[in-house]
Every structure is written in C-alpha cells, then in structure tokens.
A protein has these predicted regions:
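Short, basic/aromatic recognition patches that contact phosphate-bearing ligands
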Residues: 1-92
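Short, solvent-exposed loop/turn segments that connect beta-strands within catalytic domains
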Residues: 70, 166-170
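Compositionally biased, intrinsically disordered low-complexity regions enriched in proline and serine
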Residues: 75-76, 162, 173
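Bulky hydrophobic/aromatic content
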Residues: 82-167
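Glycine-rich, Trp-frequent "lid" loop and neighboring beta-strands that shape
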Residues: 170-176
Length: 176
C-alpha cells in the first residue's frame, strides 16, 4: 500500500486508538497517538492530530480534553454502553443457565470490545449462582433465537418433549 493510502486511514486509526485505549482515567497524549500511527506506517504531525480529533468531534464522538500537570490528553468521554451497563451484561451472561461455557467466554470477549482495554479488565469477574449448571448444548443459543423469532412474528410454537430410554432411544412424552 502506498504512503498516501496509509494516510487515508489515519483518521480511522486515531478513532480506533482512542476507543480502545482511552477513558477518563487513561487519557491519550498527542505524542502517544503519533507513536501509534508511526508504528502502523502512518506519518503524522501534531497539527494533523488536532484536526483529526476535531473531525471526530464533528462526526459525533464525545472526545474530552484534560490536563494532567503540564500534559494535555484526550479520551472518549461517552460510549454506547457505560461501564456499569457492561458489568450488568457480563453478569447476566455468566449467570445464564442456557448459555454454554464456551459461548459465555465468547460473548464476554465481545462485550469487552465495547470498553477501553483498561475498563475491560474490570469486566473479568465471576458470578456464581448456587447449584447452577451451564448447558453443554451449543445449539440451544440458536434455538432460543428461533423461538424469539417465532414469538415476534406471532407464530405458534410447538415443542416435542422427549426423554432417552435405557436403550438410548428417544421416547416422546404425551405421544409426541
């Protein structure tokens, strides 16, 4: 990719870097942004970073400036989900009986991407529900989605209940 092609991606890199690495407790300096961009093969100057931050603000990102001592930094002040909301989502996923351990880990990783890397560390918590056994059935996630789709379309939903007999054959309850 030519240098000019990398330059066209600069604004996206600045946005991504701020979203992933900044929060109120961890503002990012212009020098840190320049170093990050240079590590990605993008040349940048202080003035162009200020212009990029202003463009992101015009786009609708809530980027705040703060001063710590003699150093100015920038951080994303508001996000789609605030940290307490993300904690609630993580707790709900962890305590859900019908979500497997594997899917729980996958969903939590996705939820963590909605916070800065510093805030994401606070989402690593374990919720224990006494006598709660997580399902081993990976397809239940998709079954719940199908049930929800049927309900939202006002369709009748029919279930066939069965048990396994001694010969490990399905034996339908109530005549199937």
């Amino acid at each position: 990719m030519a240098r000019s092609s990398f330059q066209k991606l600069k604004l996206l890199h600045v946005m991504n870097y701020l979203l992933q690495n900044s929060d109120e407790e961890h503002p990012i300096t212009v020098n840190q942004m320049i170093q990050y961009l240079e590590s990605n093969g993008i040349a940048a100057e202080r003035k162009s970073i200020y212009d990029d931050i202003e463009a992101l603000r015009t786009f609708g990102m809530d980027i705040e400036e703060c001063k710590r001592g003699r150093v100015f930094g920038y951080y994303v002040a508001s996000r789609t989900f605030e940290l307490p909301e993300l904690k609630l989502l993580v707790d709900s996923v962890q305590s859900s009986k019908f979500i497997t351990h594997k899917k729980t880990a996958s969903l939590i990783k996705k939820i963590e991407t909605l916070a800065s890397v510093h805030s994401a560390q606070l989402l690593h918590r374990q919720v224990f529900v006494k006598n709660r056994i997580k399902t081993m059935n990976e397809s239940i996630y998709y079954n719940v989605d199908e049930i929800h789709n049927g309900i939202s379309k006002n369709r009748k939903i029919r279930f066939l209940y069965f048990e396994y007999n001694v010969a490990k054959e399905r034996q339908y309850r109530h005549g199937g």
